[in-house]
Swiss-Prot record:
Keyword Transmembrane helix: yes
GO cellular component: plasma membrane
Secretion signal span: none
Membrane topology: Multi-pass membrane protein
InterPro entries according to UniProt: Membr_insert_YidC (IPR019998), Membr_insert_YidC_N (IPR028053), YidC/ALB3/OXA1/COX18 (IPR001708), YidC/Oxa/ALB_C (IPR028055), YidC_ALB_C (IPR047196), YidC_periplasmic_sf (IPR038221)
Organism: Coxiella burnetii (strain RSA 493 / Nine Mile phase I)
Family: Belongs to the OXA1/ALB3/YidC family. Type 1 subfamily.
TM segment ranges: 3-23, 346-366, 369-389, 436-456, 509-529
PANTHER family reported in the protein's UniProt record: CYTOCHROME C OXIDASE ASSEMBLY PROTEIN COX18, MITOCHONDRIAL, OXA1
Keywords: Cell inner membrane, Cell membrane, Chaperone, Membrane, Protein transport, Transmembrane, Transmembrane helix, Transport
Protein name according to UniProt: Membrane protein insertase YidC
Name of the gene this protein is made from: yidC
Example of a GO biological process term: protein insertion into membrane
Length: 566
């Protein structure tokens, strides 16, 4: 095995280490929730934690004080409305009409807890994460409305495709407000509509604000790995996708205007996002940080619509859309341009999207994500076969040149310049590119990285089974069988590869599979499955190239001879 293959494996190993670091950074071990003790309210109702006030630009000091007090308050269950569809379980507080809880019944927290759905929004103080909306007055101050509804429970029944939850109330300035949430079957997008009726004798001015309020979630450090990204993001026609980490929001608030766009809070596999109702209007996007002394800070991100002017006796309407659910590109792309970029495929996003499209097309046929990974990997290796074959043959040519290079070393001794000139002349004469063995393989590295992100970021692979003992491709193999098979596949690859006369290089190449096996123990099973398939196909390709190398070389010589005759 020549030194170039060792260099190539070292490069791949370093990439794997970087990817593993990224995995630990983005998805550290899930911290245990802090237990909370609920205190009974004065009226005996069972309380639910919640933060009512809304925060909009222009009232920094007031909102800081109000927010600090509100985060420790409770709201009785008597104020809650429950809404259940086939994909969402939602709680709405009639004070303000905000969504204070959202669960996803089709996404259990784990295979061991199938009856416990993933909860995106929560009103608990230690994990505060709510979707707020309301009206501001002419001075930009939010107004809190106590709403009423016809029912306390709304359920999307069989045969229904739409569920409407209508709230009515009167603002402190006498305005009659109707707030309507519309839910649809198999849809995580919630349509919000505000209707304002000015029954007063004075004109009214105000705007719609929508925002997401979230306490920074707890994180854990894993050895030397830095913590994950779990924060805000936004998009606009100018910048389709922009991450807004908690650290950046601490340093500077968002304060910008844009037509259309969106604002969101992300986490692994899921997100919540507000999308303006009219893409032709200009909205003001903002953020606000509420410091906390004993707990993580609370972050507010949102937007305000253009001001509405409602004459006395007149009406006006405005609307927006809230998405609370999984990061599925097809769903997100239909809501707002760039929202699908919240599926964090990294800087190779276009390649990752293409690979996911292929993976999905294969899955539509085989109905198993594990087999889809295997088949997609085989297709990738077929597409890149020309590069692999060129690399294998180039390395074979370099090995053939080793005796002649050794002779040059003996002839020129310590004269490095003369040795370099003689070596390059030999390469030129024999038409050998010294980098020909590495470059074709390196071209494939971006595809490996892109496919890595597809496997770890696509919610479709979350809790997706393969065969036998693999019940979840997004987590490590519980019995470490796949990493062992991966190590054996690397040993098979070494077996079909021509060996180097250097005993040190031979030992290095046989040690690498052991190192990689240990290294891949904690990787997601889907990623290890991809690596196994890649190794097996590459081993077969190298075996075929080795078998046909002499005939290929003879054809090449004959072709060159014909060219010289011309």
């Amino acid at each position: 095995m020549d030194i170039k293959r060792i260099i190539l494996y070292v490069i791949v190993a370093l990439l794997a280490i970087a990817l593993f670091n990224a995995w630990q950074r983005d998805y550290p071990p899930t911290p245990k929730p802090t237990p909370t003790v609920e205190q009974p309210t004065a009226n005996g109702d069972h309380p639910t934690a919640y933060t009512p006030p809304a925060f909009t630009p222009g009232a920094a000091e007031k909102t800081k004080k109000a927010g600090t007090i509100a985060f420790t308050s409770k709201v009785p269950e008597a104020r809650l409305i429950t809404v259940r569809t086939d994909v969402l379980d939602v709680e709405i507080d009639t004070q303000g009409g905000n969504i204070v809880s959202a669960k996803l019944p089709k996404y259990p927290v784990s295979l061991e807890e199938k009856q416990t759905p993933v909860q995106i929004l929560s009103g608990e103080p230690n994990e505060l994460y709510i979707a707020q909306s309301g009206l501001t007055n002419g001075n930009g101050q939010p107004t809190t409305v106590q709403f009423e509804s016809e029912k306390k429970q709304y359920v999307l029944e069989n045969g229904q495709n739409q569920l409407i939850v209508q709230l009515t109330g009167r603002a402190p300035d006498g305005l009659l407000v109707t707030k309507t949430y519309t839910f649809h079957r198999d849809d995580y997008a919630i349509h919000l509509a505000y209707q304002v009726k000015n029954n007063t004798s004075k004109p009214w001015q105000g705007s719609l604000y929508t925002q997401i309020t979230r306490r920074q979630p707890p994180t854990e450090h894993h050895h030397f790995y830095v913590r994950s990204y779990n924060g805000a993001s936004m998009g606009s026609p100018q910048t389709p996708y922009e991450k807004l980490s908690y650290e950046s929001l601490d340093k500077q608030n968002i304060d910008r205007t844009s037509q259309s766009g969106w604002i969101a809070m992300q986490q692994h596999y899921f997100l919540s996002a507000w999308v303006p109702g009219n893409p032709e209007l200009t909205y003001h996007y903002y953020s606000h940080v509420i410091p906390a002394s004993d707990e993580p800070n609370v972050y507010v991100v949102g937007f305000v619509s253009p001001q509405m002017n409602v004459a006395a006796g007149s009406e006006a309407a405005t609307h927006a859309t809230l998405y609370v659910g999984p990061e599925i590109a097809k769903r997100l792309k239909g809501l707002a341009p760039g929202l699908e970029r919240t599926i964090d495929y990294g800087w190779l996003w276009p390649i990752s999207m293409l690979l996911f499209w292929i993976l999905s097309a294969v899955h539509a046929v085989v109905k198993n994500w594990g087999w889809s990974i295997i088949i997609t990997t085989i297709l990738i290796k077929i597409v890149f076969y020309w590069f692999s074959a060129k690399s294998f043959r180039s390395m074979a040519r370099m090995r053939e040149m080793q005796p002649r290079i050794q002779a040059l070393k003996e002839r020129h001794g310590d004269d490095r310049q003369a040795l370099s000139r003689a070596t390059m002349e030999l390469y030129r004469k024999e038409k050998i590119n010294p980098l020909g063995g590495c470059l074709p393989m390196l071209i494939q590295v971006p595809v490996f990285i892109a496919f890595y992100y597809v496997i770890i970021e696509s919610v479709q692979l979350r809790q997706a089974p393969f065969i036998f003992w693999i019940h979840d491709l997004s987590v490590k193999d519980p019995y470490y069988i796949l990493p062992i098979i991966m190590g054996l596949s690397m040993l098979a690859q070494q077996w079909v590869s021509p060996t180097s006369p250097d005993p040190t290089q031979q030992k290095m190449m046989w040690i690498l599979p052991v190192i990689f096996t240990v290294f891949f123990i904690n990787f997601p099973a889907g990623l290890v499955l991809y690596w196994i398939t890649n190794n097996v196909v590459q081993t077969l390709q190298q075996w075929y190239v080795n078998k046909t190398y002499e005939s290929h070389k003879a054809k090449l010589k004959a072709r060159r001879a014909r060219k010289r005759k011309r």
